[in-house]
Amino acid sequence: MVDYYEVLGVQRHASPEDIKKAYRKQALKWHPDKNPENKEEAERKFKQVAEAYEVLSDAKKRDIYDKYGKEGLNGGGGGGGIHFDSPFEFGFTFRNPDDVFREFFGGRDPFSFDFFEDPFDDFFGNRRGPRGNRSRGAGSFFSTFSGFPSFGSGFPAFDTGFTPFGSLGHGGLTSFSSTSFGGSGMGNFKSISTSTKIVNGKKITTKRIVENGQERVEVEEDGQLKSLTINGVADENALAEECQRRGQPTPALAPGPAPAPVRVPSQARPLAPTPAPTPAPTPAPAPAQTPAPSVSTRPQKPPRPAPTAKLGSKSNWEDDEQDRQRVPGNWDAPMTSAGLKEGGKRKKQKQKEDLKKKKSTKGNH
């Protein structure tokens, strides 16, 4: 007998959030489009995963399953479901696994890169029709879903189960289609998805083309191409080429906001640029100075005046001349001590004679 907890790979006390995470992982793993080489086994596993999620994601169904097993739900596995006596008076019919898959993913196509865009971009309106034909090899795009975050945590709409978006009062989405094809690997993968909305009476069609890792998004308004982006960046050249190919005029790009004028006071004058500071030259080392000789602060004596020659008698002058000791000059011949004594005696004798003559002269007068 199949154990739904084992099918999803969870424990019996797993939380509703764990159930959702497990279904997402197992449904993407065993989807028949991902396993074309083992399609029969994949279809069987995919159906079991859908049944397990239908039962364990509902509190009442899970309680009945825990008490009575699968027999308590369908009375022997006929697939048609029966009513039976239970505290819930519950009858159950398993749905098509593809319907469960589409309902879980909110009507979006997980086979295209469009699935990773804004989760509410194309949700509003009716549910899309049956899945388009898909043909994938072993290297399908599904391998990229292994690290995708939980839908329960990322998209609030999945927390309470699927709600038809038409009931939300948004009738903008009128159609949705998707076509994916490729070879044996990701190198030849191509996905094309188209969505149409009616916004303010205008028909807005968004076409996404993903090929070899490059995404091209074209937006039309009433059949007129309005914008074209490649990998999220607007490409004006590609837009012009596509419009020319379609025979349509190129839409004018919206001008950007004009810069606000800067008001300058009339008295204000532009400041002169401040010159760059010139580095000061490095001063040369001062030469060592010899200390000046100390100058005495004592006042110098004035020079002695030259002696004034006294005019007197000849005798006085001669006496002074005789009394003054004569200093020999360089021209004087050297004199011996005997010569000096002799000269002195002669002078004294002459002086005595002169005195006698003076006295005699005075006596005659």
Swiss-Prot record:
**Classification via Pfam families:** DnaJ
Region (Disordered) location? 243-365
Q: Which InterPro entries match?
A: DnaJ_domain, DnaJ_domain_CS, DNJB2/6-like, J_dom_sf
> Mind listing the UniProt keywords for this protein, alphabetically?
Chaperone, Cytoplasm, Methylation, Nucleus
Instruction: Region Interaction with HSP70: list its residue ranges.
Output: 2-147
Instruction: Provide GO CC annotations from the record.
Output: cytoplasm; cytosol; nucleoplasm; nucleus; perinuclear region of cytoplasm; Z disc
GO function term, MF aspect, one: Hsp70 protein binding
Q: Where is the composition biased (Pro residues)?
A: 252-262, 272-290
Ranges for domain J come to 3-69
Its chief place of residence is cytoplasm
Q: Using the UniProt annotation, give all residue ranges assigned to the region (Interaction with KRT18).
A: 120-243
Q: Give the source's domain of life in one word.
A: Eukaryota
Compartment(s) where it occurs, according to its Swiss-Prot or TrEMBL record: Cytoplasm, Perinuclear region; Nucleus; Cytoplasm, Myofibril, Sarcomere, Z line
Q: What cystine pairs are annotated?
A: none
What is one process in the GO biological process aspect for this record? actin cytoskeleton organization
Residues with Omega-N-methylarginine modification: R136
User: Which Gene3D superfamilies does this UniProt record tie to the protein?
Assistant: DnaJ domain
Summarize the subunit comment. Homooligomer. Interacts with BAG3, HSPB8 and STUB1. Interacts with ALKBH1. Interacts with HSP70, KRT18 and PTTG. Interacts with Slfn1; promoting nuclear translocation of Slfn1.
Role according to the record: Has a stimulatory effect on the ATPase activity of HSP70 in a dose-dependent and time-dependent manner and hence acts as a co-chaperone of HSP70. Plays an indispensable role in the organization of KRT8/KRT18 filaments. Acts as an endogenous molecular chaperone for neuronal proteins including huntingtin. Suppresses aggregation and toxicity of polyglutamine-containing, aggregation-prone proteins. Also reduces cellular toxicity and caspase-3 activity.
Protein name, as recorded: DnaJ homolog subfamily B member 6
**Could you tell me which species this protein originates from?**
Mus musculus (Mouse)
